[in-house]
Amino acid sequence: MKKGFFATAAIALALVAGPARALPEFTTILLEKVVDRTPDQTWAKIGPYCAIATWLKVTCVVTTGNQVSVGTVRRLNGKTDEIIVAATPYSYTYAQPMTDVQPQSPIFYHGTLAVEPLDRGRKTKIVYTLFYDQAPLGTTEAKIANRQQRTKRFSDALDAMKAMAESP
């Protein structure tokens, strides 16, 4: 009798608790590119929240906010929403929230675009940081492939940003 009760209780607990979730496996990709322009000149070209349309080759529409303040939301390619969660005069950090067009990202994705002065402000370093949980990607091979894809895509974006910033 006791064994049956404990077995039933264990099954009920498992059903209520739901499936076991993997522990997060956070990773960061940090990319940098030096630009032969001042931070003001660089940020004016690459910093507007929908400038991403040019340097990442996506469509972009601001659906909420003013492009510079915390709480501003942009929609990329009509399906991915990104909300500014922090901002300075030369940076912003965004996250991908749960919305009606996008279920919550299982990888807890965040990105930061920033520019930093170099050579007493005569040059600029563009810094792009990606932060996400790679655990939901599953296998080691999938994690490596995803990281390589993100690194390539955003390295290409940095090259495009450099060209934009240095153009007349």
Predicted segments, located by residue:
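Bacterial N-terminal signal peptides that target proteins for export
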Residues: 1-9
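Bacterial N-terminal signal peptides
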Residues: 8-16
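Hydrophobic ligand-binding cavity/cleft-lining segments
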Residues: 18-65
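Glycine-rich portal/gate segments that line the openings of hydrophobic small-molecule binding cavities
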Residues: 34, 51-54, 61-108, 164-168
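A short, structured loop/turn motif at beta-sheet edges
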Residues: 36-40, 84-90, 114-125, 167-168
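Extracytoplasmic/secreted envelope proteins and their assembly/folding machinery
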Residues: 39-49, 81, 112, 151, ...
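Hydrophobic pocket/interface hotspot
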Residues: 42-45, 52, 84, 94, ...
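Beta-strand/loop substructures that line and gate deep hydrophobic ligand-binding cavities in soluble
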Residues: 101-156
